[in-house]
Curated annotation (Swiss-Prot):
Residues the record lists as binding Mg(2+): 43, 82, 114
Swiss-Prot/TrEMBL keywords: Cytoplasm, Magnesium, Metal-binding, Pantothenate biosynthesis, Transferase
Active site: 181 (proton acceptor)
NCBIfam families the UniProt entry points to: panB, PRK00311.1
UniProt-recorded name of the protein: 3-methyl-2-oxobutanoate hydroxymethyltransferase
InterPro entries referenced in this protein's UniProt entry, alphabetically: Pantoate_hydroxy_MeTrfase, Pyrv/PenolPyrv_kinase-like_dom, Pyrv_kinase-like_dom_sf
Length: 279
């Protein structure tokens, strides 16, 4: 399993870090088999696998449940788990309690928190307690209501300057990495240059230290609209629908199961059961 030190080394060597967001055992197993460096168990599971219209309803229990499944599928991969909405905002004590639960019960290697300002103090408190923290800036899904929806952040000089300053504060507070979402590529490159910790982009251009995409998005598997920053490397959903349609047709036509998929009883046992040949 790669460690925090490995990710710092990769940044220094200009070796891109590959991260995938996964939510369950089978996807995590395939992600690890493919050789991904890091897995994110994101609270986006609320929309991708639980059918919510945002990340807001996701709970700490949800995150623990899904991270445990991911850990079973990827025992040798560094896992980062999102702290969901309002699990680290009310007080540092609550943040510590929820982070402790996630780290102790789920098998995560680090937690991720969104935002800056007061969240920087939370990052510092968690770090002091020995919890590795990944920060998340730019488009922060837990704050889409405040941000005015799913929009590119840091497009003007003033907001870009604030974001860069926020990133530095997160690093100073002890964050081990930064996820930077949906910002202009120039800003993504600048943040990566200015920080010593790895900057992992999602819609932040190619000049950051790594990339993260959601498993379902990059495989073309899911019902949600795919953002502009996603490149789909497969069209699994079409394959699945076609396979299901073929299964339905075979059952309706009694072409499934075939002999290869059925079990038989010895003729003498069948005779003993019915007292005569019935087959």
């Amino acid at each position: 399993m790669k460690t925090k030190a490995d990710f710092f080394r990769m940044k220094q060597a200009d070796e891109p870090i590959v991260m995938v967001t996964a939510y369950d055992f089978p996807s995590a197993k395939l992600v690890e088999q493919a050789g991904v460096d890091m897995i994110l168990v994101g609270d986006s599971l609320g929309m991708v696998v639980l059918g919510y219209d945002s990340t807001i309803p996701v709970t700490v229990d949800d995150m623990i449940h899904h991270t445990k499944a991911v850990r079973r599928g990827a025992p040798n991969t560094f896992i980062v788990t999102d702290m969901p909405f309002m699990s680290y905002h009310a007080s540092k004590e609550e943040a510590l309690q929820n982070a402790r639960r996630i780290m102790q019960q789920s098998g995560a290697n680090a937690v991720k928190v969104e935002g800056a300002d007061e969240v920087v103090e939370t990052i510092a408190a968690l770090t002091k307690a020995g919890v590795p923290v990944v920060a998340h800036l730019g488009l922060t899904p837990q704050s889409v209501g405040v941000l005015g929806g799913y929009k590119v952040q840091g497009k003007d000089a003033e907001s870009a300057k604030k974001l860069l300053n926020d990133a530095k504060q997160c690093e100073q507070a002890g964050a081990i990495a930064l996820v930077l979402e949906c910002v202009p590529k120039q800003l993504g490159a600048a943040v990566a240059r200015e920080l010593t910790i790895p900057v992992i982009g999602i819609g932040a251009g190619a000049e950051v230290d790594g990339q993260v995409l959601v498993y379902h998005d990059l495989l073309g598997y899911g019902v949600n609209r795919v953002p502009k920053f996603v490149k789909q490397y497969a069209a699994i959903q079409e394959t699945i629908v076609e396979a299901l349609a073929n299964y339905i047709a075979d059952v309706k036509l009694r072409q499934f199961p075939e002999p290869a998929h059925t079990f038989t009883m010895k003729e003498e046992e069948w005779v003993a059961l019915y007292g005569g040949k019935q087959s």
